[in-house]
């Protein structure tokens, strides 16, 4: 790799929606930073089979449903 052009990796803590924590290497944040996930593999319908509702962050889901809810599939 070319020196001086790649971001530095460091250890961060990731906190999943159920409170589970793990450490990983990342270029996000700084050494020891904490990343709190809003949606992860335990809460996203794509991985849970669609049994759970998505949390409506900032009204985006409501706005989508209002606009396209009547289409039906």
Swiss-Prot record:
Give the family per the record. Belongs to the bacterial ribosomal protein bL31 family. Type A subfamily.
Cited function: Binds the 23S rRNA.
InterPro entries recorded:
Ribosomal_bL28/bL31-like_sf, Ribosomal_bL31, Ribosomal_bL31_A, Ribosomal_bL31_sf
The keyword RNA-binding is annotated on this UniProt entry = yes
Superkingdom of this protein's organism: Bacteria
Q: Name one GO cellular component term.
A: ribosome
- What SUPFAM superfamilies does this protein's entry cite? L28p-like (SSF143800)
Record note on quaternary structure: Part of the 50S ribosomal subunit.
Gene Ontology biological process terms in this record: translation
What name appears for this protein in its UniProt entry? Large ribosomal subunit protein bL31
Q: Which Pfam families match?
A: Ribosomal_L31
Q: Which UniProt keywords apply?
A: Ribonucleoprotein, Ribosomal protein, RNA-binding, rRNA-binding
Statement: the UniProt record of this protein carries the keyword Cell membrane: no
- One MF term from GO for this chain? structural constituent of ribosome
